[in-house]
């Protein structure tokens, strides 16, 4: 089993840390509106869930090359991304309620 997935994540983290230290935006990152960024995040969560579901189905059917550890890792990634999305939604709702309760 290759560890290239971890190496890619480490490279992305290092690039993010470097660009944050330099104060420059990352290459290829477009400045979008809030709604487009929110939609993109929801799409990524959906893609993670679909990929994990597909991996699990392939493992259950006995497709060669699909290992149990990969399935479990994808399922956990999917779970964590969904939990993150729910927490972001909760924060947005709380912020909206705070704004709505402000007196004018």
UniProtKB/Swiss-Prot annotation:
Annotated compartments: Bacterial flagellum basal body
Main location: other
Signal sequence region: none
Swiss-Prot/TrEMBL keywords: Bacterial flagellum
GO molecular function: cytoskeletal motor activity; structural molecule activity
Superkingdom of the organism of origin: Bacteria
GO process terms (BP): bacterial-type flagellum-dependent cell motility
A single GO cellular-component term on record: bacterial-type flagellum basal body
PANTHER family xref list: FLAGELLAR HOOK-BASAL BODY COMPLEX PROTEIN FLIE (PTHR34653:SF1), PTHR34653
Family note: Belongs to the FliE family.
Record's protein name: Flagellar hook-basal body complex protein FliE
Protein's organism: Edwardsiella ictaluri (strain 93-146)
